[in-house]
């Protein structure tokens, strides 16, 4: 192969590599942002579940509140 052809191919590979490095960095930033957002959402969900449990009375009566069964 000619030197100019090799130089052209090398330049093309370097260009592709640079583009891929930028893409990988962008994807890494996106994944990191999503992980942070998911952690926040998990915490919000945990707090909502706690509030829901605290505000909703149980529909199951305790044993002391239950009427005794009829005797046959």
UniProtKB/Swiss-Prot annotation:
Could you tell me the superkingdom of the organism this chain comes from?
Bacteria
Checking InterPro entries in the record gives: SlyX (IPR007236)
NCBIfam families associated with the record: PRK02793.1
Cited HAMAP family: SlyX
UniProt-recorded name of the protein: Protein SlyX
* Family membership noted in the UniProt record: Belongs to the SlyX family.
One Pfam match, given by its short name, reads SlyX
């Amino acid at each position: 192969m000619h030197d100019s052809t090799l130089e052209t191919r090398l330049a093309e590979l370097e260009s592709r590599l640079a583009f891929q490095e930028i893409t990988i960095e962008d994807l890494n930033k996106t994944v990191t942002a999503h992980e942070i957002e998911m952690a926040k959402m998990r915490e919000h969900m945990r707090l909502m579940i706690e509030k829901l449990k605290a505000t909703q009375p149980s529909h199951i009566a305790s044993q002391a509140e239950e009427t005794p069964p009829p005797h046959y």
